[in-house]
A protein has these predicted regions:
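N-terminal glycine-rich phosphate/pyrophosphate-binding loop and immediately adjacent elements
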Residues: 16-145, 149-152, 321-322, 332, ...
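C-terminal structured subdomain/cap of oxidoreductase catalytic cores
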Residues: 19-53, 101-102, 106-107, 243-252, ...
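Conserved redox-cofactor binding core of oxidoreductases
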Residues: 126-257, 266
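Surface-exposed beta-strand-to-loop junctions
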Residues: 96-104, 116-121, 164-174, 210-216, ...
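Short, glycine/acidic-rich hinge or "gate" loops at secondary-structure transitions
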Residues: 157, 486-498
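Mid-to-C-terminal "cap/lid" subdomains and adjacent gly/pro-rich loops that border
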Residues: 155, 168, 297, 307-423, ...
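Short acidic, glycine-rich loop/turn motifs
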Residues: 84-91, 270-277, 355-357, 421, ...
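Fungal secretory targeting signals
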Residues: 1-20, 288
Length: 586
């Protein structure tokens, strides 16, 4: 974007702010999902759309554009950093939850990895009561939004294989592989090692069956060598539309129509401008909250939508009694190990290995399935108690049973192992579990401070989650100690084989994981798309229960964790949600 367009962006934002205009649709948050919704709704020239975004337009920021310096923006001004204290399961450590503060949201600061997950996980959404939400339906929207750039022959030789039938070729979102993936030695040795461990190469991660080993695509433009975030993909082609405006500001709460009907009716949002002024913007039709899995529940609570017990403590009158708001927060549990290489590896290592429960637990799988099933009720009771009964034990147990079925009967992938070369002769091996039974929560910390949420991480709060992460860690260690991959490894520099030997006991693993496990920043579920009686916040039309015209579209509505990176599902969900909103026009 040139200087003129930058000034134009600021001018439009200023004018919209100064007038406190009214639009057909107003979207809180110009992030990954919000800009998808804005683009699709504004395709009709007679529909006016406004996006309120607190962050800047960073499309020309070299740090954002770069595909070589991943996570360089983690401590920058374009990154929200929300603190959280863990429980004794993780040694009461401080954790930081991060989200993008920019046009494009977290898609402007993340690792760009594009993995959708398993078919059965999406089909479970429909089993949970979300009519029409299943693998086939969401899959069609994945293809609608994607412009997949096929890899070169050189890239294919080092593992960048693909199945053209599972990708789109004319959507707005570029998806492909970096120009230089890795030299051949790493791919050949890693492929052979994983194949010897029963996890051989697959053609494509994104066809709904990701079990195995393969290079992972990323949301980037391989021809230009730049990141493809939602601002580039969805806002750039739409920014010249006169019916689409971006307003600089921070949404605080929904404004409501007077009256006490059965359904609450939103009239717009109240937001804070960069100057600190409190301004109201009107919505003729609907408001859409796309403020992230951290902030979307906060906006609802600040507006009187949530658990009356929590709202009362905050001094907020209850507008809609909806106890599920802010609950069911789920994240992946991630751990990293570092290896020194015997020779340097050039290029990007971007390979994912995704195992099932059988791959991870082996002969213990059946007995573990049985013992775990017996614990679901007690886990559900304990989790319900931590939220003072916000979601009933029976509702949680029903959701747990479906998750248990996915893990042990549907044979979904339950973990991911992802190596990255550090550029200084080292290799960072990250591994995480994808389907934890540990849930946390996110709520307002005070009535008027939406900037500092109260986050309860609650990671590794069930013994199964610890057992699962331990088993995945052992699988990771085994791979790097198995030929021919071990030929590339000089030693394990962190934690080191002295602290965590290859034959480490369960107790040694527990000590290591409790001191080192982190949140993977793949948060979903805090405004879950579920029936209200199951702890849901939005229905299958992404409309907030008890409201006539309030919708939520972002990672917060994904009802259960997926074996993928959250960004890809958010794009698919947002595309489908946009059509659900459009359907209400008829």
């Amino acid at each position: 974007m040139n200087t003129y367009k930058s000034l134009q962006f600021l001018l439009l934002a200023y004018l919209a702010t100064a007038r406190g205009d009214t639009f057909d649709y107003v979207i809180a948050g110009g992030g990954t999902a919000g800009l998808v919704i804005a683009n699709r709704l504004s395709e009709r020239s007679d529909i006016t759309v406004a996006v309120i975004e607190a962050g800047d337009d960073v499309r020309q920021d070299p740090g954002v554009q770069s595909i070589d310096f991943l996570f360089a923006n983690f401590n920058a001004s374009i990154n929200y950093q929300y603190p959280s204290v863990t429980g004794p399961e993780l040694g009461s450590r401080n954790l930081t939850y991060r989200a993008g503060k920019a046009l494009g949201g977290t898609s402007a600061i993340n690792g760009m990895v594009y993995i959708r997950g398993d078919k059965a996980q999406y089909d479970a959404w429909e089993k949970l009561g979300n009519k029409g939400w299943n693998w086939n339906s969401v899959f069609s929207y994945y293809k609608l939004g994607e412009r997949f750039i096929a890899p070169s022959s050189a890239q294919i030789e080092v593992g960048a294989t693909y199945d053209a039938s599972v990708h789109g070729d004319s959507g707005p979102l570029d998806n492909g592989f970096p120009f230089i993936i890795s030299n051949g030695s790493f791919y050949d040795k890693a492929r052979a090692t994983w194949e010897s461990l029963g996890l051989g190469p697959i053609t494509d991660l994104n066809g709904g069956d990701p079990r195995g080993f393969v290079a992972a695509p990323q949301t980037l433009d391989p021809e230009a060598g730049v990141r493809e975030d939602s601002a580039r993909a969805y806002y750039t082609p739409a920014e010249a539309r006169t019916n689409l405006k971006v307003i600089k500001g921070t949404v605080k709460r929904i404004t409501w129509a007077s009256g006490s009907g059965k359904q609450a009716v939103a009239t717009g949002f109240e937001y804070v401008s960069p100057s600190g002024a409190i301004i109201k913007v009107g919505a003729r039709k609907e408001v859409v909250i796309s403020a992230s899995a951290y902030r979307s529940p906060l906006i609802l609570e600040a507006s009187g939508v949530g658990n009356p017990k929590i709202l009362k403590k905050l001094g907020i009158p209850t507008k809609v009694n909806l106890p599920g708001v802010g609950e069911s927060m789920q994240d992946h549990n991630i751990v990293a190990m570092t290896y020194n290489l015997s020779n340097n590896i050039t290029g990007r290592i971007g390979y994912a290995t995704m195992p099932t429960a059988q791959d991870v637990f082996g002969s213990k799988t059946s007995s573990l399935a049985a013992s775990t099933f017996k614990k679901l009720r007690s886990w559900a009771k304990a989790l319900s108690a931590t939220s003072d009964g916000a979601i009933s034990p029976s509702a949680i147990e029903r959701r747990f049973r479906i998750q248990h079925d996915l893990i042990f009967n549907k044979n979904i992938t339950i973990a991911e192992l992802f190596p990255t070369n550090t550029g200084d002769g080292g290799l960072l091996e990250q591994f995480w579990t994808s389907m934890p039974f540990s849930w946390g929560s996110v709520h307002l910390s005070s009535r008027d401070n939406i900037e500092v949420p109260s986050i309860t991480a609650n990671l590794l709060s069930t013994d199964f989650d610890l057992d699962m992460l331990t088993a995945v860690g052992r699988l990771s260690q085994k791979a790097y100690a198995t030929a021919p991959l071990t030929d590339l490894i000089a030693d394990n520099s962190s934690p080191g084989y002295t602290k965590l030997p290859l034959d480490a006991s369960d107790e040694q693993w527990a000590t290591f994981l409790k001191a080192n496990a982190l949140n993977a920043l793949h948060v979903v579920g805090s405004c879950a798309m579920l029936p209200k009686e199951l702890g849901g916040v939005v229905d299958s039309d992404v409309k907030v229960h008890g409201t006539r015209n309030v919708r939520v579209v972002d990672a917060s509505i994904i009802p259960m964790q997926l074996s993928g990176h959250t960004m890809a599902p958010v794009y698919g969900v947002a595309e489908m949600a946009a059509d659900r909103i459009k359907a209400s026009w008829k």
